[in-house]
Design a protein with these regions (language model features):
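Active-site regions of metal-assisted phosphoester/phosphodiester hydrolases
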Residues: 1-134
């Protein structure tokens, strides 16, 4: 999701909701196992009224397809109040956000870890999410 999507054509928005709708046939029906993971470049903290690409809308849409955010499911944290950041803007530790997610359906996640800033900042402004499944 970002403004750079326009280079692929005027009809390409780069919005996560549009990508989910485009690929939803790949996700299978509600009984199939599936994982959607990566940098969503979005958080409920930036939601603005009336914006279709609000993260709350994205999360609700994924939930309607049978997906759940494994971080929030396992840690019992609410969106926008995450205790572990996944992104450090301009690689600064104090500019931290949670914008990377692992959503799954019909899987049993056991544990989800986020790589520590100190070990990963050399490689990326994002920390990896590592999930163990049953």
């Amino acid at each position: 999701y970002n403004h750079r999507a326009r280079k692929f054509g005027a009809e390409v928005s780069g919005n996560t909701i549009d990508a989910i709708n485009f690929y939803k046939d790949w996700f299978g029906d509600k009984n199939e196992k599936c994982i959607i993971a990566g940098d969503f470049n979005n958080s409920i903290i930036w939601d603005k009224k009336g914006n279709d690409n609000n993260f709350d809308n994205i999360n609700n849409h994924l939930m309607s397809l049978g997906f759940a955010s494994n971080y929030h499911k396992l840690r019992g944290e609410i969106f926008g109040k995450e205790s572990s950041p996944t992104f450090f803007h301009t690689k600064k530790e104090h500019k931290k956000y949670h914008i990377d997610y692992i959503y799954s359906k019909n899987l049993n996640p056991l544990e989800l870890k986020i790589g520590p800033y100190s070990e990963w900042i050399t490689f990326s402004d994002h920390s990896p999410l590592i999930m163990d499944l049953d």
